[in-house]
From Swiss-Prot:
The gene is ruvA. Residues 144-155 are annotated as: Flexible linker. It comes from Aeromonas hydrophila subsp. hydrophila (strain ATCC 7966 / DSM 30187 / BCRC 13018 / CCUG 14551 / JCM 1027 / KCTC 2358 / NCIMB 9240 / NCTC 8049). This is Holliday junction branch migration complex subunit RuvA. One of its GO terms (molecular function) is four-way junction helicase activity. Coiled coil: none annotated. Belongs to the RuvA family. Residues 65-143 are annotated as: Domain II. Its main location: cytoplasm.
Length: 204
């Protein structure tokens, strides 16, 4: 099993990053709450990974901290929640925000996440509340995770909006919904990551 990768960021296409380790390029899917903190292309990064083997694919999911990976693993233990939905959930909320929503039984917040209906939200609370008890109070997550970090904005390229919309679709949002929200929040001076961040904030 691949548990951690340390290498150079070769390509960033939300929510996927290509990391070169020892001459081998690893495609790693990351929650956007983790993706925002990745270094720039050409810089070195360390990613904690969860390896999934399916009949048709072998997939790597990556996280900045072991605790985020631990939460991802707790999520996929929940009935009806697979890796793709878990990725979408942790893209719409930081790990800390999700744990607090479950602890406080905030169904109204959870149903705003892509792929999460009322029944799924209720199941998340019922099945995970006891398992997540004390996670935040015991400082299992870093303070930086409580709010999304500000990033320096690069000049928005003409296809930034298209890339941002594609990333939202990959996370489970419907194409029309993704395009509409991107059009609403996108502005000059915003990078792809900036657009995605603002889109997710407005959706949740």
């Amino acid at each position: 099993m691949i548990g951690r990768l340390r290498g150079v960021v070769i390509e960033k296409q939300p929510p996927e990053v290509l990391l070169e380790v020892g001459g081998v390029g690893y495609e790693v899917q990351m929650p956007m709450s983790c993706f925002y903190d990745l270094p720039e292309i050409g810089k070195e990064a360390t990613i904690h990974t969860h390896f999934v083997v399916r009949e048709d694919a072998q997939l790597l999911y990556g996280f900045n901290h072991k605790q985020e990976r631990a939460l991802f693993r707790e999520l996929i233990k929940t009935n009806g929640v697979g890796p793709k939905l878990a990725l979408a959930i942790l893209s719409g909320m930081t790990a800390t925000q999700f744990v607090l929503s479950v602890e406080r039984e905030e169904i109204s917040s959870l149903v705003k996440l892509p792929g999460v209906g009322k029944k799924t939200a209720e199941r998340l609370v019922v099945e995970m509340k006891d398992r997540l008890k004390g996670w935040v109070s015991h400082d299992l997550f870093s303070p930086a995770e409580i709010t999304l970090p500000a990033r320096e904005s690069a000049l928005r390229a003409p296809d930034s909006s298209e890339e941002a919309a594609s990333a939202l679709v990959a996370l489970g949002y419907k194409p029309q919904q993704a395009s509409q929200i991107v059009s609403k929040v996108a502005a000059d001076g915003m990078s792809v990551e900036d657009i995605i961040r603002e889109a997710l904030r407005s959706l949740v």
